[in-house]
Amino acid sequence: SAKVVITEDANADKKVDWQDGAIAYRSIMNNPQGWEKVKDITAYRIAMNFGSQAQNPFLMTLDGIKKINLHTDGLGQGVLLKGYGSEGHDSGHLNYADIGKRIGGVEDFKTLIEKAKKYGAHLGIHVNASETYPESKYFNENILRKNPDGSYSYGWNWLDQGINIDAAYDLAHGRLARWEDLKNKLGEGLDFIYVDVWGNGQSGDNGAWATHVLAKEINKQGWRFAIEWGHGGEYDSTFHHWAADLTYGGYTNKGINSAITRFIRNHQKDAWVGDYRSYGGAADYPLLGGYSMKDFEGWQGRSDYNGYVTNLFAHDVMTKYFQHFTVSKWENGTPVTMTDNGSTYKWTPEMKVELVDAAGNKVVVTRKSNDVNSPQYRERTVTLNGRVIQDGSAYLTPWNWDANGKKLPTDKEKMYYFNTQAGATTWTLPSDWANSKVYLYKLTDQGKTEEKELTVKDGKITLDLLANQPYVLYRSKQTNPEMSWSEGMHIYDQGFNSGTLKHWTISGDASKAEIVKSQGANDMLRIQGNKEKVSLTQKLTGLKPNTKYAVYVGVDNR
C-alpha cells in the first residue's frame, strides 16, 4: 500500500513548497526503532577489545562511563563494544551469544548493562552478519560462500582467516535464532546492534529488502539497528559509523548529504555529513553540525582522553542540541566555488535553518557569510526565541534534559559554555534566570570544580575563560554525584579515576606517590624520587574460595 499526504503552508513562510511537504511527510513516514533516544546520546565512543588481550573489560568500561558522566555533567552516552565476544574484535563471528570470558563473561556484561542505566549510557555491540571464523560453532560448509570457480570467498584475515557467508542462506537457516540466543543470555537492557560491513555485498544480496529484514530481526529483540556505511540502511538505522567517524574511511562515504533527507530526519539519526573541511561540499561547516566521533578506549589506537572531551564540546553538544528540535525552514545561499580532492565544483551552502519543538520554542541557525573564502563562512549565529546562544566560536547553550531526555527540575536546569578561543564574551540570560547571582563550574574528570559566583547585571553576564575548556552554569550552587569506582572488580578504583589515593594504605614516604596524567590524559599512579621503599596496598574483596583469579598490573618502569 502507499500513503499520500496533502498539506498547506506548514512553516508559516506564506508559500507552499517542498519544505511544507517534508514537514507533512513526517506524519506518514516510517520512524526507525529507537529514534527517540538519538538526541540525548551526546557522548558516543568505542571501547575496544582485541586479540585475547582484554584491554577494556566490561567493568572497566563502567568506570569510563562514570568518568564521562562527571566530565560532561551528566550528558547521555553511547558506547559501542567492539570485541564483546569470543577473543575480541573480529573473532568468533556468527556466534552472537558467545560473550567474551576474558573481559568478564555474561555476569559482568549484565552488570555493566544494569549499572550503566543510572548514567544514561546506551550500550551496543559490534557484530558481523557477512562472514564467519573457524572458531565459531556456526562455521560449516553449507553457509560458506564460494566463488564461481568453487573456491571460498575470503574475508578478513588479520587473525584467523574469515570466510564470507551466503546471507540469503543464513536468513533461512537460523540467523534469527542466533539473535534470540543473545537476547536470552543477556536479558533486557542492551540498546543497539551495530552490523559491521553489511551493505558491501561480500555476503551476497545486502540490498534494501535484505537489510530491512535484518533490521526487523534485531528490532524484534528490542534493539536499535546501526550500520557501518554512511548511506546504509537509511530506512531503519539510527547510527552510521562512517558518517560519524570523520577520519575513518574516505570522503566519498561520510554520510547522507541530501538536504531534503536531513530536513526530514535530522532529529532521528546520526547519519549526516559532519564538519570536516578537507572533504568539501556539505562537509565544510554544515549549519546543523553532524556527529564527530572520537575515542579514548583503543579503537584505531586512540587513547587521547582530553582530545575526546574537547571534540565532544566543540562539535557534538550543539549537534545534539539541534536534534531536540525539528527542522521547519531551510534557506540556501548563492553557489560558491570549492576545490578539494582533485576537483573544482560549485556548491550551494545552506545559509539559514529554523527549527521548532513541540512547545513552540524556535531555534534559528545562520551562517555569517556566503563567501567561502571568508573565515565567517565557517561561523554561525544561533538564537533561541530571539536570544543569542551561540556566536561564532562560543556558545552558552541551555540544557534542560537529563541523560535520558527527561526534563530537569528548575533548580537543575543549566547552560553549557564552551569557546574555542580565549577572551571575554557577554550573554543575555533568559528572563527566568533573572537571579542576581549565578554559579559557574569548570568541568573536569572530577566533575564540577572551581565554583565561581557571578553577578548578573541588566540580565547579562560576561565570561572570560579558558579556550577549549567546558564549563557549566547554574542558578544555584551544585554538588557532584558520589561515584563508587570499579564495582565488582575486587579492588577499589583500579584506574585511579577518583583522583585520590585515600583508598590505599601507603607505607614509606607517601609524598612520593601521586596520581598523574599520561600523555593521553589517562590517570596513573607514579612513585618517583623516593629514597626508600614505597608501597601501596589494598585488600582484595569478593573473592570466592577454590576459585582461580588472574591479576593484571600495567607498569611503565623508567
Where are these regions (language model features)?
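Non-cytosolic beta-sheet module surface loops
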Residues: 429-432, 529, 542, 555-557
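Extracellular carbohydrate-recognition regions
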Residues: 478-510
